[in-house]
A protein has these predicted regions:
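Terminal targeting signals and extreme-terminal segments of soluble enzymes
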Residues: 1-72, 78-96
Length: 96
């Protein structure tokens, strides 16, 4: 079951067009990953000797978020391999 993080879009997240700046989505996703890990998994990862390093991110931007939107970020650990883990995240609007 995915962990859910809620983000409210604020004015300082926006670019000149009134959309969330693409770099801000990376911050939102990172905050959601930390929410998942701090929810009880972080100590286990550290005990196993995993270094929590992002080596690849693939993003499909489907529609812009704007000021006042409330976003839900679903985060789940998809696979844990000997040298890597795959975390899957999806951002949706709270009302959708």
């Amino acid at each position: 079951m995915p962990h859910c993080t809620e983000i409210k879009v604020r004015g300082y997240h926006l670019d000149l067009y009134g959309h969330v700046n693409n770099a801000r989505y990376l911050e939102f996703l990172e905050a959601a990953r930390w929410d998942l890990l701090e929810g009880g998994n972080l100590a286990w990862f550290m005990q196993q000797g995993y270094a929590l390093v992002v080596s690849r991110i693939d993003i499909r931007y489907l529609r812009p978020a704007t000021m006042g939107d409330t976003l839900q970020i679903a985060t789940r650990l998809d696979r844990l391999l000997p040298r890597a883990g795959i975390i899957v995240q999806q951002i949706t609007w709270q009302d959708n």
